[in-house]
Amino acid sequence: MKYDIIGDIHGCFQEFQDLTKKLGYNWNSDLPIHPDQRKLAFVGDITDRGPHSLRMIEIVWELVINKKVAYYAPGNHCNKLYRFFLGRNVTIAHGLETTVAEYEALPSHQQNMIKEKFITLYEQSPLYHVLDEKRLIVCHAGIRQDYIGRQDKKVQTFVLYGDITGEKHADGSPVRRDWAKEYKGTAWVVYGHTPVKEPRFVNHTVNIDTGAVFGGKLTGLRYPEMETVSVPSSLPFVPEKFRPIS
């Protein structure tokens, strides 16, 4: 099986459509379908900050749950939106406010449909995907070699948030260790979460979050070819979001 793994979309539907067309998908049925049966895989954070979060929920639900032709691994923004939809007390900030505003503008019956679709998508998707006979891992923020196969709380925190130290940067964002430098596994780990200006290959890991929602690019990785394909963002460039990884 051949896959096209898509970085953090964050509600950037137009960039997602542009990227999938560039990857050879057609949209004749209002969904990206590849003529050679390649499958899309999403590294999570499909919503928040960008203009079309609900459209992305509907597309990913349709591909993953209804048609079963794609894979989705949730990100930290997905986890927070899931908790919001469950009625938990979450802070509506850091991008969630844009998704909530879209949601609250809908009539109640459409709100219920979107909520049910996202809850189903989240609950029926694993924390990370192990594909191609264990040669490929698709996850949100990365995974240590010794965590592969585990689902416990420590692994969940790592996969959703990265290798956080507990410290904070001046802007309040968490300080993260560069786990990829220590990765010695043979499986390719394809992930996102931390915006980088260019796809970052370190050992057998690839970070494909090129900051589409921050004016960078939306990137896909073609597997097993290991080629990256990107399209430019239509949004303003926010340089401080592309912090050096340390």
From Swiss-Prot:
Keywords: GTP-binding, Hydrolase, Nickel, Nucleotide-binding. It catalyses: P(1),P(4)-bis(5'-guanosyl) tetraphosphate + H2O = GMP + GTP + 2 H(+). It holds the Pfam family Metallophos. The keyword Magnesium does not apply. GO terms for molecular function: bis(5'-nucleosyl)-tetraphosphatase (asymmetrical) activity; GTP binding; nickel cation binding; phosphatase activity. Its EC number is 3.6.1.17. Transmembrane segments: none annotated. The keyword NADP does not apply. Its cofactor is Ni(2+). InterPro entries: Ap4A_hydrolase (IPR050126), Bis(5'-nucleosyl)-tetraP_PrpE (IPR023937), Calcineurin-like_PHP_ApaH (IPR004843), Metallo-depent_PP-like (IPR029052), MPP_PrpE-like (IPR041780). GO terms for cellular component: cytoplasm. Asymmetrically hydrolyzes Ap4p to yield AMP and ATP. Belongs to the PrpE family. NCBIfam families: PRK13625.1. This is Bis(5'-nucleosyl)-tetraphosphatase PrpE [asymmetrical]. It comes from Bacillus cereus (strain ATCC 10987 / NRS 248).
